[in-house]
Amino acid sequence: MVLEEFGILQKFNYQHRVIIKHVKHLAIMGNNVTVSPLDYRYGRDEAKSIWSREGRHERQLDVERALIWAHCQLGRVSPEDYDKVAEIAKPEIVTADRVDEIERETRHDIMALTKAMAEAAGDSGWCIHLGATSNDIVDSAVALQIRDSINLQQDTLKKLLSTMCDLAERERDTVMLGRTHGQAAVPITFGLKVAVWVDEFRRHLDRLDELTPRVITGKFLGAVGTGAAQGENAFELQNLIMQNLGLETPIATTQVVGRDRYIEWVSWMANVSTSIEKALQEVRNLQRSEIAEVGEYFDAEKQVGSSTMAHKKNPITAENACGLARIVRSMIIPSYENALLWHERDLANSSAERFTLSHSMILLDDIIIKCDKVLSKLGVDSERMLYNIKAQNGLVMAEKLMIALVDNGMPRDDAHEVLRSASMNAINTGEDLEDICARSDAISKIFTRQELSDLFKPESHLGFSGEIVDQAVKIARERI
């Protein structure tokens, strides 16, 4: 018993030493500890800079500056005081570190910001934050972040759409197997498949244009949205601030802008991420070994597909983007929850929104770029596509032949039954459907052997695939 207790004590002491060592290690590393993969693995600097600590700080400074500018226009603040505030409202003067230092005392981020600004402005600091509430600053700064994010999204989406247009045009007439329910259906072209993506992403750009004015809206009517603290010129003050910042002016708010605006933008990002995953999921499925019709670019000289299976060429960029798309979509639920604020507002939304808005935008930007990378270098094996059609033993042309029989006088139900019976025979025996149909009295009395062979050519049953590609690409190119 004593030995057993001694063993337990030794184990406890060892675990205790490990914990202490880990805590000391973290203390030494300080702010260099990184946990989120956004810090070191995912996302571009262009997107991260908008939602970084510094990006948020810089925009909040600009909102505070715009407030004093508006007061100056209305004669409440002198031009000299405004000039001084504008001079110090820069992140290299009023630093984020100084604001954080003050916040450790005040436990209020915007009050810390105003104190740091007043400290730097000297005698002109009397007017800083005049008539404002914290969320006048916060929500207007977030609107600036959203505006800058949307500008970036417009650019990246247009580039992706252009890449899709190029691919659709290049593969306009590349015949391949259409599949429904995971089964062979009828022939299509790879260009048509991509044209569907083209039209979908063009609609995403249209939606972004439509929602932008609603989501780049700030506010400046104070603690409960009455404008009482702003005085008799409250509306004019708010309008001046929004005009100076390049934001939309709201009609009515509480202490915060309506979170329906954020929901709309996050939902749009989730929608786009779904479209990207759908396109890249198609690439991944068509790259399956048993299909092998397309392939993500693989650097055969250097790239490794597996640490043990040396032959592997995996669609890792597409897989990576598909995984991140799921994170973007997951931000929808907390975005809806953030709209459920008590009365004129509470603070339950604040911490969640530091994740939902930034992570959605940064990850969506990342997967748009990755999708563009995959599609711009996508390998398309047209010979394999024809091979896969031929492997269906003519079954994919059953619809074509059925329609031809109807056009030559056979009732539609009768034609369907003739082809259904012949198709089941082909499936059960492994014989080519064309050969079975050639022996059918119902078919051979209508078509010669050559006419029947012509009906089994995949390129004869593409409908208006090419014209659809042309139209989708034309409309999209006009849009971008």
What are these regions (language model features)?
Residues 6, 12-14:
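Aromatic (phenylalanine/tyrosine) cluster motif
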Residues 28-221, 227-228, 235-240, 249, ...:
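A helix-coil-helix interface module used to build multimeric assemblies
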Residues 169-191, 293-312, 343-352, 376-396:
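Glycine-rich cofactor-pocket loops
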Residues 261-293, 303-360:
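A conserved active-site cap/scaffold subdomain adjacent to cofactor or substrate pockets
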Residues 327-408:
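Long, amphipathic alpha-helical stalk/connector segments used for oligomerization, subunit docking
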Residues 377-442, 470:
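C-terminal alpha-helical interaction appendages
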